[in-house]
UniProtKB/Swiss-Prot annotation:
One of its GO terms (molecular function) is translation release factor activity, codon specific. Residues 280-310 are annotated as: Disordered. Belongs to the prokaryotic/mitochondrial release factor family. This is Peptide chain release factor 1. The modification N5-methylglutamine is found at Q233. GO terms for cellular component: cytoplasm. It is found in: Cytoplasm. Its main location: cytoplasm.
Length: 355
């Protein structure tokens, strides 16, 4: 089917769905049709913009050929033709991008996990910096950032930390943050002024709902124990800490942040559900491994994706060769959009080239 034929088919489907919704259907049929109609809305707007510009260009070219025009009118028509000829490829690209297969998880909220990697206490301090950076970015985007768990070192660093980030299309924006983030800076305790390199790992998981992942009680082993502080001492006299193991996969989540065992269990289940959903997605993607060759990075947590060099004031994303000399804006204020938009655009370009 040609590109033009495909556009006609989509417009026809959208029109028929509109008529169907107006006919008084109810129940599951109405819900299904409403969902399909809403999913087509964005691409239909882009198709109509493309068709309008294409029609206007054709009319302008015909007018130029068929009419006797004075110089002023001819110049005006030529300018209009030039503008439309530049606009049309951009509108066509926008249509093609909107027709790309959608990641079913893109519209979901996300769970982000940050873990200190190599580099000792400096790595833990960097993990805290990253976690706070994502919190600032979430506030900037108007998302709700809920801390799930923090394992701190007692002097400002985080061994690991996780949060739930709720909002529209959160996962689509943050999914490229998964991987190894490296920092180069001079630690406050470094008397010789030497630059140290350390790392932290970020994992971004789509937040799963009950309809995405069904967890049977028989598949869970739940252990409770007393919460301990940074030095290992017990900080609670009740068994409020919870460790949940999903027996079929061996995936384990332990949580002790809340004083309530019930709250710790609820948060642990949320993280477990997200990890199981991500594992399900990973297996599906492995089956379609050929389609992943063109993506920007693999999302592999072992892949080094970005370097934060404090002495030089730069942040470099190695997947798209983008360097910004604005480390304070990025790290302290969470201004990540320039990286995120470039990563999304590059991913779309790779996918378009594979069509």
């Amino acid at each position: 089917m040609s590109f033009s034929d495909n556009l006609v088919k989509i417009l026809d489907k959208y029109e028929n769905l509109g008529k169907k919704l107006s006919s008084g259907i109810i129940g599951d049929e109405f819900v299904k049709a409403s969902k399909e109609y809403a999913e087509l809305e964005d691409v239909v707007v882009k198709i109509k913009q493309y068709n309008k510009a294409k029609s206007e260009l054709e009319e302008a070219n015909n007018f130029r050929l068929e009419m006797a025009l004075d110089n002023a009118t001819l110049e005006m028509i030529d300018n209009e033709i030039h503008t439309l000829e530049n606009l049309l490829p951009k509108l066509e690209r926008a249509v093609r991008i909107s027709l790309l297969p959608k990641d079913e998880a893109d519209s979901k909220s996300a769970i982000i996990e940050v873990r200190a990697g190599s580099g000792g206490e400096e790595a833990a301090l960097f993990a805290a910096v990253l976690f706070n950076m994502y919190q600032r970015y979430s506030e900037f985007k108007g998302w709700r950032f809920e801390i799930l768990a923090i394992s701190d070192t007692g002097i400002g660093g985080y061994k690991e930390a996780s949060a739930s980030i709720k909002g529209k299309d959160v996962f689509s924006k943050l999914k490229f943050e998964s991987g190894v983030h490296r920092v180069q800076r001079i630690p406050e305790t470094e008397s010789q002024g030497r630059i140290h390199t350390s790392a932290a790992t970020v994992a971004v998981l789509p937040e799963a709902e009950g309809i995405d992942i069904k967890i049977e009680d028989k598949d869970l082993r739940i252990d409770t124990y007393r919460a301990s502080g940074a030095g290992g001492q017990h900080v609670n006299t009740t068994d409020s800490a919870v460790r949940i193991t999903h027996i079929p996969t061996g995936i384990t989540v332990a949580l002790q942040d809340e004083k309530s065992q019930h709250k710790n269990k609820a948060k642990a289940l949320k993280i477990l559900r997200a990890r199981l959903y991500e594992e399900k997605r990973r297996q599906k993607e492995q089956e379609r491994s050929d389609s992943r060759r063109g993506q920007v990075g693999s999302g592999d947590r072992s892949e080094r994706i970005r370097t934060y060099n404090f002495p030089q004031g730069r942040v470099s994303d190695h997947r798209i060769n983008l360097t910004l000399y604005k480390i304070d804006e990025v790290v302290k204020h969470g201004q990540l959009d320039e990286f995120i938009e470039a990563l999304i655009a590059n991913d779309e370009a790779k996918k378009l080239s594979e069509l």
